[in-house]
Swiss-Prot record:
Domain of life per record: Bacteria
Pfam families membership: RNase_T
Compartments reported by the entry: Cytoplasm
Keyword match 4Fe-4S: no
GO CC entries: cytoplasm
Annotated active site: Y139
First-tier enzyme category under EC: hydrolase
InterPro entries attached to this UniProt entry: Exonuclease_RNaseT/DNA_pol3, Oligoribonuclease, RNaseH-like_sf, RNaseH_sf
Gene: orn
Domain Exonuclease: 17-182
Keyword Amino-acid biosynthesis applies: no
Name of the featured protein: Oligoribonuclease
Family: Belongs to the oligoribonuclease family.
Species assigned in the record: Bifidobacterium longum (strain NCC 2705)
Free-text function comment from the UniProt entry: 3'-to-5' exoribonuclease specific for small oligoribonucleotides.
């Protein structure tokens, strides 16, 4: 399959990551679980924060609240979120505000990448509940949990000494912790910038091709 998006070229100033974290009433989107909090922080690809970010609490339906299991209910009670969503925004209001915020940091004609931790779960809910927002983002994403799983298996010391987390299951704090975690992995086990030069990169690529099982 040909990926037409590989033809997209961005200058450094156009490169953006849109970090998003969501809190939900559960993970069963088809069983009626809903978004109750969405936070966004924009960064460049060097992981420099471009703005302090936004956080919006969304009022869930009574059905979604009643659908919560005890674990989720206790989690949102401890974080204080359960006491805030009664005065939260409607889903439509939240999507509009988040979309407007994202577009402030998106150069015209560019769709930034979504970033986060175990971002697949968040993306599933965003695709379902905030399709207009997602239409402005690239279909690719940066998932910090990928680096975590690689570190766990390839660099155990890096994994064991990763920065501690204490976000308390609030979306904005979770984003900052995920961002810091990726900054840590970048310093701990990735080649220092600017990485291998052109000749070294070609040599590495040639070695990979030569040893690929496709050539056996």
């Amino acid at each position: 399959m040909v990926d037409s998006h590989d033809a997209e070229t961005y200058s450094a100033k156009d490169s953006r990551l849109i970090w998003i974290d969501c809190e939900m009433t559960g993970l069963d989107i088809f069983g009626g679980d809903e978004l109750v909090e969405v936070s966004v922080v924009p960064t460049d690809f060097d992981l420099n924060v471009l703005d302090e970010g936004v956080d919006y609490v969304i009022k869930p339906s009574e059905k979604a609240v009643n659908h919560m299991n005890d674990f989720v209910r206790q989690m949102h009670t401890r974080s204080g979120l359960i006491n805030e969503w009664e005065n939260g925004l409607s889903l439509a209001e939240a999507e509009q505000k988040v979309t407007e915020y994202v577009l402030r940091f998106t150069p015209e004609g560019v769709r930034p990448l979504l970033a986060g931790n175990t971002i697949g779960s968040d993306k599933k809910f965003l695709d379902h509940y905030m399709p207009n927002l997602m239409s402005h983002l690239h279909y690719r994403s940066v998932d910090v949990s990928t680096f975590k799983e690689l570190a766990r298996r390839w660099y155990p010391a890096v994994y064991e000494n990763r920065p501690p987390k204490n976000g308390g299951h609030r979306a904005l704090a979770d984003i900052i912790e995920s961002l810091d975690e990726l900054r840590y992995y970048r310093k701990a086990f990735m080649a220092p910038a600017p990485g291998p030069d052109d000749a070294a990169s070609k040599a590495i690529a040639a070695d990979i091709v030569a040893t690929s099982i496709l050539n056996k």
